[in-house]
């Protein structure tokens, strides 16, 4: 079992129960899922780019990504409905906890010119979204085999009812928020 999951059950639950005066342990917010999304707009011209992006995402997440397709045709972007334009992975359970642990302790500190994550990226319901400009911050990606530096979106979905609860949950995991 991931260390972070044990830490959540032993420490974070107690801390949040006292902070927000919950009556039941089930009221304490928890991380539900983590979604990783990589949009590959250049995949229209070169299909190989999407395969490379999917391979990178598979290495980062540990599971095979789903290829996302365009929902509707947009002439300005030269895409048609059904064209593959990106890939995504939804992590739950053990893989989610392991990824979150790697994100906080290894990947985020490796971000170039890092000054902390924005605490304003909550959506109003306790879910946190962040963008990563380079996939090479993850140790699973071999820098020499990267054909192109791509970014990805990371969304952490929680059961929190408000942004304050979600922020307190992630701060309890020592998320490096900007002061």
UniProtKB/Swiss-Prot annotation:
Subunit structure: Part of the 50S ribosomal subunit; part of the 5S rRNA/L5/L18/L25 subcomplex. Contacts the 5S rRNA and the P site tRNA. Forms a bridge to the 30S subunit in the 70S ribosome.
Function recorded in the entry: This is one of the proteins that bind and probably mediate the attachment of the 5S RNA into the large ribosomal subunit, where it forms part of the central protuberance. In the 70S ribosome it contacts protein S13 of the 30S subunit (bridge B1b), connecting the 2 subunits; this bridge is implicated in subunit movement. Contacts the P site tRNA; the 5S rRNA and some of its associated proteins might help stabilize positioning of ribosome-bound tRNAs.
A cellular-component GO term for this protein: ribonucleoprotein complex
GO-annotated biological processes: translation
Keyword terms of this UniProt record: Ribonucleoprotein, Ribosomal protein, RNA-binding, rRNA-binding, tRNA-binding
GO MF annotation, one: rRNA binding
PANTHER family: 60S RIBOSOMAL PROTEIN L11-RELATED
NCBIfam families xref list: PRK00010.1 (NF000585)
Name the record gives this protein: Large ribosomal subunit protein uL5
InterPro entries on file: Ribosomal_uL5, Ribosomal_uL5_bac-type, Ribosomal_uL5_C, Ribosomal_uL5_CS, Ribosomal_uL5_dom_sf, Ribosomal_uL5_N
Native organism taxonomy: Bacteria, Pseudomonadati, Pseudomonadota, Gammaproteobacteria, Enterobacterales
UniProt superkingdom: Bacteria
Source organism per UniProt: Pectobacterium carotovorum subsp. carotovorum (strain PC1)
Family: Belongs to the universal ribosomal protein uL5 family.
């Amino acid at each position: 079992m991931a260390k972070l999951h044990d830490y959540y059950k032993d420490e974070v639950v107690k801390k949040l129960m006292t902070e927000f005066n919950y009556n039941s342990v089930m009221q304490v917010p928890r991380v539900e899922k983590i979604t990783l999304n990589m949009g590959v707009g250049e995949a229209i011209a070169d299909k190989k780019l999407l395969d490379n992006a999917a391979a990178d995402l598979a290495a980062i997440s540990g599971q095979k990504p789903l290829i996302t397709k365009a929902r509707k045709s947009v002439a300005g972007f030269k895409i048609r409905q059904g064209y593959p334009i990106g890939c995504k992975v939804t992590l739950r359970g053990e893989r989610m906890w392991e990824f979150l642990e790697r994100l906080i302790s290894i990947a985020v500190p490796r971000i170039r010119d890092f000054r902390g994550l924005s605490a304003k990226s909550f959506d109003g319901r306790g879910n946190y979204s962040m963008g990563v400009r380079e996939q090479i911050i993850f140790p699973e990606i071999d820098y020499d085999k990267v054909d192109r530096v791509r970014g990805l979106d990371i969304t952490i979905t929680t059961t929190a009812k408000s942004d304050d609860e979600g922020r307190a949950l992630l701060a309890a995991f020592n998320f490096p928020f900007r002061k």
